[in-house]
Structures are given as structure tokens and as C-alpha cells.
């Protein structure tokens, strides 16, 4: 942690900020944290209350429950195990559909490249008809090159919010869209 290099946080202007949502997975709630000098935390807290209305008391109580030791121990194994299983299932199916994968060993999504120069924009055109969509690679291009982007044939497929029971249906929808384009 960066904090080990700070002798006295209350005598500094340093903010150490993080988020605890990836491993704790609480639907509908995002939890972040800030470590800083007490005076800075008070100012930040005042702004949060004034500028954003603050966080509801039930949300605060729920957030505290998320950090109970037993829940954290369970989340540290259950979340990676679940995502690993989903990553493997979807990854195998995507490869069988002729997609190239550019994914790591963690996370809850796959980066895929469509075959034959097909664009993710065209893929979404077919997916929209089925009530589905993917995140187009061009939307992640920091240079905003649009159709000239080298990411035009890439898309991100997020399996994090999907129930395991939807797998067959998800793959069937994607397969129909890809077949229509290739």
C-alpha cells in the first residue's frame, strides 16, 4: 500500500483512494474508500452531503455488513471461482464461433475480435434485434477514431451480470448474429 510511505497522513495532502466492489460483488451498490488527513476527509464528507445528498443510512449499514470477516473470506473464493467458471464456458464457446480472444485470467468479461473484418457496430445491429448488445471496441478507443479505429472488429462481452442458466441462450443469440454477418 502507498500508505507505508507516508509518515503522518494528517500532515499531508495525499489522498489514497480505492474501490472494494470487484471482489465483494453487491448488486446495486458501489463502495469506495479514501484515506487522507482528517481535515480533508471532513471537507470531502461535507461536500458529499451537500453536493450529492449523502448516502442513505440503510446503504451505509449494508456497506458495513459487506466488510464482515466471514463474508469477505467467502467472497475471496466464491467470486473468483464463479467468474473463472463463466470465463471458461464463454471463452470455449466464443472460440468455437470463430472469435479470437484477448482476455486475461481475471475479470468478468472477454475481449473478442470478430472474424473477417466484421465490425462490432454491425454485430450490435443484429444483437439489438434480439434485445442484446456488446460494448464496441471503438467505444474504448482513447483516440476516438470511429470507423478508422483498429478496434472496430473488437467487442467486450461482459458475463458478470449473466446468470449461468442464460449461457445457452446467450451463445445462441451471438451465434445467429455472427452467422448473419459472415
What are these regions (language model features)?
Residues 4-81, 176-178:
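Conserved core segment of the aminotransferase class I/II
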Residues 74, 94-103, 182:
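Surface-exposed helix-capping loop/turn segments at secondary-structure junctions
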Residues 29-30, 106-108, 153-156:
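Short amphipathic alpha-helical segments
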Residues 64, 80-91, 101-113, 150:
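Conserved glycine-rich beta-strand-loop-beta hairpin in the small C-terminal domain of fold type I
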Residues 9-10, 129-130, 142-182:
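PLP-dependent enzyme catalytic core of the Aspartate aminotransferase-like
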Residues 35, 111-113, 158-160:
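Short hydrophobic/aromatic beta-strand micro-patches
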Residues 14, 99, 132:
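Short, conserved active-site loop motifs that form the nucleotide-linked donor/cofactor pocket
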Amino acid at each position: 500500500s502507498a500508505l507505508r510511505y507516508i509518515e503522518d497522513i494528517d500532515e499531508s495532502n495525499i489522498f489514497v483512494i480505492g474501490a472494494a466492489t470487484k471482489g465483494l460483488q453487491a448488486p446495486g451498490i458501489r463502495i469506495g474508500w479514501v484515506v487522507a488527513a482528517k481535515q480533508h476527509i471532513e471537507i470531502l464528507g461535507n461536500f458529499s452531503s451537500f453536493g450529492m445528498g449523502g448516502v442513505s443510512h440503510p446503504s451505509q449499514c449494508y456497506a458495513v455488513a459487506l466488510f464482515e470477516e466471514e463474508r469477505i473470506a467467502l467472497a475471496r473464493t466464491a467470486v473468483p471461482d464463479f467468474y473463472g467458471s463463466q470465463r471458461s464456458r464463454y471463452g470455449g464457446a466464443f472460440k468455437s464461433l470463430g472469435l479470437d480472444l484477448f482476455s486475461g485470467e481475471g475479470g468478468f468479461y472477454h475481449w473478442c475480435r470478430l472474424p473477417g473484418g466484421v465490425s462490432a457496430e454491425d454485430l450490435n445491429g443484429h444483437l439489438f434485434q434480439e434485445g442484446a448488445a456488446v460494448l464496441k471496441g471503438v467505444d474504448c478507443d482513447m483516440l476516438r477514431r470511429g470507423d478508422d479505429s483498429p478496434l472496430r472488429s473488437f467487442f467486450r462481452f461482459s458475463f458478470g451480470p449473466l446468470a449461468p442458466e442464460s449461457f445457452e441462450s446467450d451463445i445462441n443469440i451471438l451465434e445467429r448474429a455472427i452467422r448473419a454477418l459472415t
